[in-house]
Amino acid sequence: DSINAIDWNLKHVNAGQTDYYKELIRLRKGHPAFRMTTAEQVARHLKFDKTLPGLISYSLIDNANGDEWKEIKLVFNGSGKPQEVRIPRGEWKVIAEDGRIKADGLGSSKGGKIIVPATSALILAKEK
């Protein structure tokens, strides 16, 4: 019937978004840092950064919840313009940037000043 019908064309129209969500789920399932269950764990491993309006930036530190990654840096730019953030120097694996995500990594970064595009997320992981 027309009320409960599935528009199968939307599967193809939204394939990119669906793939992005699948990678987010894969990232969460593959890393215990994203599955902390107690307030104590969160208090011990979650550190927020001071940011400009429109930005949220935080780190999951010290191999949170037994994760293989020593630190995970997450930056969300909810503003309508690109924003510059400072990432601590080091060897970072780029997990998500500019509307792309890959749980195994998109590339690498040395940290420093990074531009986060408008309405996007940046996820970095430090293994050591």
Predicted regions and their residues:
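Acidic Ser/Thr/Pro-rich low-complexity disordered segments
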Residues: 34-37, 101-106
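C-terminal beta-strand-rich structural cap/linker in extracellular carbohydrate-active enzymes
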Residues: 106-128
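Pocket-edge structural micro-motifs
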Residues: 59-62, 96, 118, 126
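Loop/helix patches that line or flank the sugar-binding groove of alpha-linked glycan CAZymes
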Residues: 1-91
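Short acidic, gly/pro-rich beta-turn/loop elements at beta-sheet edges
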Residues: 68, 83-84, 104, 124-126
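A broadly tuned, weak detector of single residues within folded domains
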Residues: 17, 93-96, 112
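Solvent-exposed beta-hairpin/edge-strand motifs
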Residues: 89-101
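Conserved active-site loop/cleft motifs that coordinate metal ions or position small ligands
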Residues: 74-76, 94-95, 123-125
